[in-house]
């Protein structure tokens, strides 16, 4: 599985602590402090998973989610909200976020969300491999 993650949060402390945590878990972490920087990094080296805060200045996490999904629908996006705003969390799920995690971030909850995202990535890979194999078999006949 691709172990690259893009972590987006306007709070430097969260980027630092989560970046260290994710690196310790074996992920290759890129960080961005806002949506514009995140999109630039995303386009340069698309990660398998994006972790983003919902409430950020300029471009919020919902807009970032929509733009990422428009460019690469298979990207798994996990949203953070520290504002107890379930309406925004639900809105993010409607825009095809993989999951959401509330702040302060619980390590176990984040690990479950990352595991679920990894399983979805692996299922898509297996389906793609299976489809390619079937297409080759059809071509051979």
Predicted regions and their residues:
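Acidic, metal-coordinating helix/loop segments flanking the phosphotransfer/catalytic sites
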Residues: 6, 31-49
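Acidic catalytic/metal-coordinating carboxylates
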Residues: 33-37, 60-63, 84
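Short amphipathic alpha-helix used as the core "switch/output" element in two-component signaling
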Residues: 40, 62-74, 91
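Charged docking surfaces used in two-component/phosphorelay signaling
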Residues: 16-24
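Receiver (REC) domain active-site loop signature in two-component systems and cognate sites
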Residues: 56
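C-terminal output helix
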Residues: 87, 101-114
């Amino acid at each position: 599985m691709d172990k690259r993650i893009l972590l987006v949060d306007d709070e430097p402390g969260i980027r630092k602590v989560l970046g260290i945590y994710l690196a310790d878990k074996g992920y290759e972490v890129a960080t961005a402090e806002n949506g514009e920087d995140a999109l630039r990094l995303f386009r340069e080296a698309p990660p398998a998973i994006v972790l983003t805060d919902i409430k950020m200045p300029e471009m919020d996490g919902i807009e970032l989610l929509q733009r990422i999904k428009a460019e690469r629908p298979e990207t798994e996006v996990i949203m953070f909200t520290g504002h107890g705003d379930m309406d925004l969390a639900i809105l993010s799920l409607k825009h095809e976020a993989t999951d959401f995690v509330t702040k302060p971030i619980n390590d176990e909850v984040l690990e479950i969300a990352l595991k679920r995202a990894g399983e979805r990535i692996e299922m898509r890979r297996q389906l793609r491999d299976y489809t390619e194999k079937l297409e080759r078999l059809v071509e051979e006949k």
